[in-house]
Each structure stands twice: as structure tokens, then as C-alpha cells.
Amino acid sequence: MQRNMLKSKIHRVAVTHCELHYEGSCAIDEDLLEAANIVENERIDIWNINNGERFSTYAIKGERGSGMISLNGSAARRAQLGDLVIIAAFAVVDEAELKAGWKPDLVFVDDNNRIKGSRDHVPTQNWT
């Protein structure tokens, strides 16, 4: 059996640019791409925490160290500057890979979209 699993996530990153007339895509700081194991032209899902919008596009490289998250083309209509978004990518994984300990790459950022930490799992949610 093959499963569609979370492969990469950049959590609560702020939108820095919205370029309506740029060729469609999402430019992401190269440091964030590498940390999250997302490659150029890979399909990504973007979930806007501020307004609930959910959409798909593809990743392109943004200037390294800039903190850039630029929504381009029609995606620019889905967010405003400063909105917090989650960027995710998925992979098809077989049972053997899962049993071998396959894990996602989860990246967490500070208020300037700089990497502050990473994990390979989402903690168990508790009732509190």
C-alpha cells in the first residue's frame, strides 16, 4: 500500500510579497526551502491562517536569507502582506519506507521568517 504523507511543512510563516502580475508560484527563501526539503517547482499547498484560504501552487527560489514568502500570480489574491500561512508538501510513501522510520521535515520560524527550529513529528494533541 502507498500513502500520501506530509513530507514538508513551514509553519506560521508571514507573507512578505504579493505579486499579482508575476508568473504564478510562491517564492520561498532558499534557506527555508532547504530546511523543509522542498525543491524548486515542487507542488505545495498553502493554508492561510488569517482567512482560511487553502490553495496549491509550486515553489520557486526566493533570495537566500531574506525571509521572503512571495505569493505570485493568482495566489496573490489569496493573502495580504503579513498574513501567516502554513506551507506544506506531500509525498507518496510505501509501507516499507514507513516501517523504516520515514519522517517529515517540519520547520518553525520567528517573526522575521528566520528558522528558529525544526522537528520530524507533530506532537500528540492533548485535551487541556
From Swiss-Prot:
<keyword id="KW-0865">Zymogen</keyword>
<feature type="binding site">
    <location>
        <position position="57"/>
    </location>
    <ligand>
        <name>substrate</name>
    </ligand>
</feature>
<feature type="active site" description="Proton donor">
    <location>
        <position position="58"/>
    </location>
</feature>
<dbReference type="InterPro" id="IPR009010">
    <property type="entry name" value="Asp_de-COase-like_dom_sf"/>
</dbReference>
<keyword id="KW-0068">Autocatalytic cleavage</keyword>
<comment type="pathway">
    <text>Cofactor biosynthesis; (R)-pantothenate biosynthesis; beta-alanine from L-aspartate: step 1/1.</text>
</comment>
<feature type="modified residue" description="Pyruvic acid (Ser)">
    <location>
        <position position="25"/>
    </location>
</feature>
<comment type="subunit">
    <text>Heterooctamer of four alpha and four beta subunits.</text>
</comment>
<dbReference type="InterPro" id="IPR003190">
    <property type="entry name" value="Asp_decarbox"/>
</dbReference>
<feature type="active site" description="Schiff-base intermediate with substrate; via pyruvic acid">
    <location>
        <position position="25"/>
    </location>
</feature>
<protein>
    <recommendedName>
        <fullName>Aspartate 1-decarboxylase</fullName>
        <ecNumber>4.1.1.11</ecNumber>
    </recommendedName>
</protein>
<keyword id="KW-0670">Pyruvate</keyword>
<dbReference type="GO" id="GO:0015940">
    <property type="term" value="P:pantothenate biosynthetic process"/>
</dbReference>
<comment type="function">
    <text>Catalyzes the pyruvoyl-dependent decarboxylation of aspartate to produce beta-alanine.</text>
</comment>
<keyword id="KW-0566">Pantothenate biosynthesis</keyword>
<dbReference type="GO" id="GO:0004068">
    <property type="term" value="F:aspartate 1-decarboxylase activity"/>
</dbReference>
<dbReference type="GO" id="GO:0005829">
    <property type="term" value="C:cytosol"/>
</dbReference>
<keyword id="KW-0963">Cytoplasm</keyword>
<keyword id="KW-0210">Decarboxylase</keyword>
<feature type="binding site">
    <location>
        <begin position="73"/>
        <end position="75"/>
    </location>
    <ligand>
        <name>substrate</name>
    </ligand>
</feature>
<comment type="similarity">
    <text>Belongs to the PanD family.</text>
</comment>
<dbReference type="Pfam" id="PF02261">
    <property type="entry name" value="Asp_decarbox"/>
</dbReference>
<keyword id="KW-0704">Schiff base</keyword>
<dbReference type="GO" id="GO:0006523">
    <property type="term" value="P:alanine biosynthetic process"/>
</dbReference>
<keyword id="KW-0456">Lyase</keyword>
